[in-house]
């Protein structure tokens, strides 16, 4: 949903959990006692999260072509480390036309439109809850913040956008996806330079018990917000009808630099803010911490036991064959997959890079790879950043990248247990090292995500 619209190509996925505890014979998994898991066991997460990612990709027509999995726990010096708060990172690659990559400024009278599904009590407070330690809120609040997916609806909306993007002239002025904060976040960012008036009664409601706050702020998935000229509304409606995508004209662009939700039937205004109050200069966040020099015990091993160690290492989910992740799904859905996880006559998941063609005839494409080094980062956060970048680059070199390093962009994703003593300082070291290393290589980092609350609390 960048600029005036873009086209998704393929998905990626990373799963990180604590040890799966598949059986009693895995001695390394007994270093920490098994916890009373709050919602799902690690093995359930590994199975069900991957099922969901694969199923979504198949239904949407966006193949899952690369990924990674890691399980880890460590107990030393009264510090318990592990992915009890699990990571399921869903990413992806796509492309857009250069001339459509910049959002245009809306004009007064332009129409504010929503493509996609209706509002439900889903994803309430998702941004706040995802930024809090798991267990900090009641289970009801945490479960209420969980998003749900609807690939069929997303495909319909995406196809409507594709129809505009692939036209000779794309009439979309600006487009934005719905994420945390729902309509409040998405629609306000569309009109942050001008102002907008949203008719609360025109917002599609699937649950009649929703309050105004829930209608405005829910994170029901598979919706896009966009601005389009009034004269071009019929064109978008025809394309949406062809793709069977629900479409709603919910408001107008104004020039009063206010963002307002108003019910035309009751006259109520549950929200009416000046844009400067929403997008003005926010106070800088100051993170105060101290550096703690953590030392870890030297590895205690015997050369006589190397065959045993090897057998154990080969059983780790991060090392063992990943066919349980790949062989349950069509990895070539859509017909543009040039390289996915599996290779050879046995289709073993050994490829380091995923590649998608841009069309069915040409030889232009997009490559993607993944790198991470959380264990190295425990010992040295700066080294961990460099190793993660190095791993991603050593994985992607198997694709003939146009313009070499200048043709590569990074997405930096930080999952960190901030506010624990010493962790903010370690994060600073890691981010600075990542920035310095990328600059030295001449690689840009245009995007990324942070989850700075990777801490699990138990009752």
PLM features: what roles do these ranges have?
Residues 1-459:
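Glycine/proline-enriched, intrinsically flexible loops and inter-domain linkers
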């Amino acid at each position: 949903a960048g600029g005036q619209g873009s086209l998704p190509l393929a998905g990626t996925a990373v799963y990180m959990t604590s040890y799966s505890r598949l059986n009693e014979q895995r001695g390394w998994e007994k270093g920490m006692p098994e916890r009373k898991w709050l919602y799902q066991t690690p093995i359930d997460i590994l199975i069900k999260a991957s099922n969901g990612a694969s199923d979504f990709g198949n239904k949407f027509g966006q193949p899952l072509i690369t990924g990674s999995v890691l399980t880890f726990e460590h107990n030393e010096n009264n510090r318990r480390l592990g992915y009890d708060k699990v990571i399921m990172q869903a990413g992806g690659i796509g492309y857009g036309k250069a001339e459509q990559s910049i959002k245009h400024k809306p004009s007064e009278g332009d129409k504010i439109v929503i493509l996609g599904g209706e509002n439900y009590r889903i994803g309430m407070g998702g941004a706040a809850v995802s930024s809090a330690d798991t267990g900090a809120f009641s289970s009801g609040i945490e479960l209420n913040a969980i998003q749900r997916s609807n690939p069929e609806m997303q495909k319909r909306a995406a196809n409507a956008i594709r129809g505009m993007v692939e036209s000779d002239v794309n009439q979309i002025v600006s487009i934005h996806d719905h994420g945390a904060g729902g309509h409040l976040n998405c629609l306000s960012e569309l009109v942050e330079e001008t102002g907008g008036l949203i008719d609360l009664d025109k917002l599609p409601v699937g649950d009649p018990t929703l309050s105004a706050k829930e209608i405005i702020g829910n994170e029901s998935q598979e919706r896009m917000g966009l601005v389009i000229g009034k004269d071009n509304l019929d064109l978008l409606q025809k394309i949406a009808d062809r793709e069977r995508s629900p479409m709603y004209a919910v408001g107008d662009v104004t020039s009063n630099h206010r963002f307002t939700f108003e019910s035309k039937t009751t006259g109520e205004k549950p929200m009416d803010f000046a844009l400067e109050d929403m997008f003005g200069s926010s106070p800088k966040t100051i993170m105060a911490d101290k550096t703690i020099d953590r030392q870890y015990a030297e590895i205690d091993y015997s050369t006589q036991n190397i065959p045993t160690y090897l057998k154990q290492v080969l059983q780790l989910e991060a090392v063992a064959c990943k066919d349980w992740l790949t062989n349950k799904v069509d990895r070539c859905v859509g017909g543009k997959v040039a390289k996915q996880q599996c290779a050879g006559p046995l289709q073993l998941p050994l490829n380091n890079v995923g590649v998608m063609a841009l069309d069915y005839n040409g030889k232009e494409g997009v490559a993607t790879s993944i790198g991470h080094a959380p264990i190295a980062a425990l010992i040295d956060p700066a080294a961990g950043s460099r190793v993660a970048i190095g791993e991603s680059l050593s994985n992607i070199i198997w694709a003939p990248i146009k313009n070499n390093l200048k043709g590569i962009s990074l997405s930096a994703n930080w999952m960190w247990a901030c506010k624990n003593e010493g962790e903010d300082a370690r994060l600073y070291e890691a981010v600075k090292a990542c920035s310095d290393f990328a600059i030295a290589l001449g690689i840009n980092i245009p995007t990324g995500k942070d989850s700075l609350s990777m801490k699990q609390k138990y009752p």
